[in-house]
């Protein structure tokens, strides 16, 4: 679904975003994909593997969620602190807000990894698919509204100085909606971190990453 929507939206992006800015958009999205792989650390696969063990499901759910939440939070805080130097390094010195949004997107997406895995493990494919589709549709609605209906003055007040920022912002809104929709599952997480289990998961997950 997300790939289909991206394919449909590409003509809109090409029409409203100049070539140089579109290259920035593409490069940053490639970077987001790479960072998401690193931050997930293969723990989605490890979650399925160790949850299948007898009496291990809750411990695996809690331990894997807290590890990914902590890792993603450390990444987010680091990027927010060193936002401008990072923006300078990647050539976004005039638009450091892109790097901030990128960090928030990565944080929210990785916070959702284990809850999404929980839905699949519990045999709830309809709920899993519904959340994914709602995210994609909401993201599409936001970006189309920004390009076609919302006045430029209003979007600029939200920090979107250029039209290339519209896809980034809409992606952030989609990721935020995902976290909200998954919040009932996130609230099931208990304050539990099993060290021995974590190291077993880490040993299993690292080659997968």
Name each model-derived stretch.
Residues 17-21, 35-68, 87, 118-127:
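Transmembrane-helix boundary and interhelical linker motifs in polytopic inner-membrane proteins
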Residues 1-44, 71-80, 105, 140, ...:
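Signature of the first transmembrane helix
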Residues 28-31, 66-70, 104, 130-138, ...:
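Hydrophobic residues within alpha-helical transmembrane segments
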Residues 34, 77, 91-118, 137, ...:
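Alpha-helical transmembrane segments of multi-pass membrane proteins
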Residues 154-166, 180-209:
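Interhelical loop/hinge segments that connect adjacent transmembrane helices in multipass membrane
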Residues 15, 74-93, 149-155:
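Short membrane-interface helical motifs at transmembrane helix boundaries
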Residues 136, 140-178:
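Helix-loop-helix hairpin linking two adjacent transmembrane segments in secondary transporters
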Residues 1, 58-62, 68, 99-105, ...:
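Alpha-helical transmembrane segments of multi-pass membrane transporters/permeases
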